[in-house]
């Protein structure tokens, strides 16, 4: 029997994702026995400050990649939103699983919705992207950093450290945690980050058998859409924790029309000001250039200056009060 080793983070959500992939592989390839190599990433260890203030990239992926390069794992399962656009030599982002619900959700034990939060209410989030979009909509709120795994964040909410918090819907759904929260509201006005709600399958590049197995996990429409998002991020030069939102979708095909793909993006300061929105739609056969085109269009409108200033704001000790 063949053995295949999956590198995974040791958090509850990461393990759910890894076991999900393990089950899919063993079902499709009964001759393969899958083992998990559980690893604690740098991002899991840094709990005293926002990752946006740490600098660098790959906080949740580098240790898994090191295990593959060292020969201790054949593939790694990542939340795609955590995977930098640069993949180390000798590795390959081979497959992307079908994307599920990308929503960000408002969670509270006291208030039914974002609109019901009073002025000055405290909202918890780790993400500069969420902070940016929240404060653009509700500049009267106070946003505080929220670290820890999903269960830790929910505990802090229940203890009353926050009036509300914002998390990704998909993690709560996968861990069956939505039933424990009285008030849940999907924030439809939020644009998600690159790759949210999809899994990235990274492999050792010179192993054709592992590639054959991994490719059975790939969902081509999701692969195309997330490539547009990753191309955009690569050209803009933003890291996974920058205040940048981008989302590509394939448009519903009408019988008499050429299929199209659309992408929308948003860049701004973490305090919800200096926001730049833009979207583009092209025929599906031009998807390979769509991310680059949108990035270049936003650069022409000042995106790089906005990102530079956003980084300065995020790193300043005397951040604005609402940060």
UniProtKB/Swiss-Prot annotation:
Pathway: Porphyrin-containing compound metabolism; protoporphyrin-IX biosynthesis; coproporphyrinogen-III from 5-aminolevulinate: step 2/4. Keywords: Porphyrin biosynthesis, Transferase. SUPFAM superfamilies: Periplasmic binding protein-like II, Porphobilinogen deaminase (hydroxymethylbilane synthase), C-terminal domain. The keyword Lipoprotein does not apply. One of its GO terms (biological process) is protoporphyrinogen IX biosynthetic process. Monomer. Tetrapolymerization of the monopyrrole PBG into the hydroxymethylbilane pre-uroporphyrinogen in several discrete steps. This is Porphobilinogen deaminase. It comes from Sulfurovum sp. (strain NBC37-1).
């Amino acid at each position: 029997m063949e053995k295949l080793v999956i590198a995974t983070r040791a958090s509850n959500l990461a393990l759910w994702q890894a076991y999900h992939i393990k089950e899919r592989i063993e079902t499709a390839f009964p001759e393969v026995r899958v083992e998990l190599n559980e690893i604690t990433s740098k991002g899991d260890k840094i709990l005293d400050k926002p990752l946006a203030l740490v600098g660098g990239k790959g906080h949740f992926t580098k240790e898994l990649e090191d295990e593959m390069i060292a020969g201790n794992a054949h593939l790694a399962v990542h939340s795609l939103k955590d995977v930098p656009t640069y993949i180390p030599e000798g590795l390959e982002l081979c497959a992307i699983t079908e994307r599920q619900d990308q929503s960000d959700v408002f969670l509270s034990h006291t208030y039914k919705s974002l609109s019901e939060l009073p002025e000055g209410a405290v909202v918890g989030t780790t993400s500069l992207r969420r902070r940016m979009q929240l404060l653009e909509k509700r500049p009267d709120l106070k946003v505080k950093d929220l670290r820890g795994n999903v269960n830790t964040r929910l505990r802090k909410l229940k203890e009353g450290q926050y009036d509300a918090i914002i998390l990704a819907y998909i993690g709560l759904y996968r861990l069956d945690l939505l039933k424990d929260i009285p008030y849940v509201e999907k924030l439809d006005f939020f644009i998600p980050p690159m790759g949210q709600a999809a899994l990235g399958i990274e492999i050792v590049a010179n192993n054709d058998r592992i590639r054959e197995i991994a490719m059975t996990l790939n969902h081509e429409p999701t692969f195309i859409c997330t490539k547009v998002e990753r191309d955009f991020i690569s050209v803009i030069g933003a890291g996974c924790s920058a205040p940048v939102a981008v989302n590509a979708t394939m448009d519903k095909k009408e019988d008499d029309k050429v299929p199209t793909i659309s992408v929308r993006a948003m860049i701004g300061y973490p305090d919800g000001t200096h926001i730049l929105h833009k979207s583009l739609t092209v025929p599906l056969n031009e998807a390979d250039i769509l991310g680059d085109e949108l990035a270049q269009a936003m650069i022409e409108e000042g995106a790089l200056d906005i990102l530079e200033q956003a980084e300065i704001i995020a790193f300043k000790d005397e951040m604005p009060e609402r940060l």
